[in-house]
Amino acid sequence: MILVDTSVWVDYFRGTDSPQAAKLDSLLGAEPLAIGDIVLTEVLQGVDGDREFEQTRALLATLDLVQVGGADVAVEAARNFRRLRALGVTVRKTVDTLIATRCIVSGYELLHGDRDFIPFETFLGLRTVDCGDALRG
């Protein structure tokens, strides 16, 4: 299962030419995709207008909905934050820690366009969808 992060959805809906948005476009309807409940909230918060909101909500409702948090993930996310901090890595957003940890715990791949996930890949085994080295360059 591939969980798609907010950064990719924003690029996709804005028509931004990014490797991640192109990858999402190729995966829609071809691969099982999931959206986290927190990601759903973030994406829908950014939508202008009622009609666009309903169209976006309808599209996202076709995906598997994943509860990102929960007690076990919350505790493991705190552990992951502490592990990275001990390595000198500053995690800027708690939501990214939760999303990365849900993916690690559940064995999901993450499709993202956010450099903040790279330490989770490098040090904690987060599996991600290959879109080239666009974030690493």
Regions found by a protein language model. Name each.
Residues 19, 65-113:
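Active-site neighborhoods of divalent-metal-dependent phosphate/nucleic-acid chemistry enzymes
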Residues 5, 11, 96, 114-116:
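Acidic active-site catalytic centers that drive phospho-/nucleotidyl reactions
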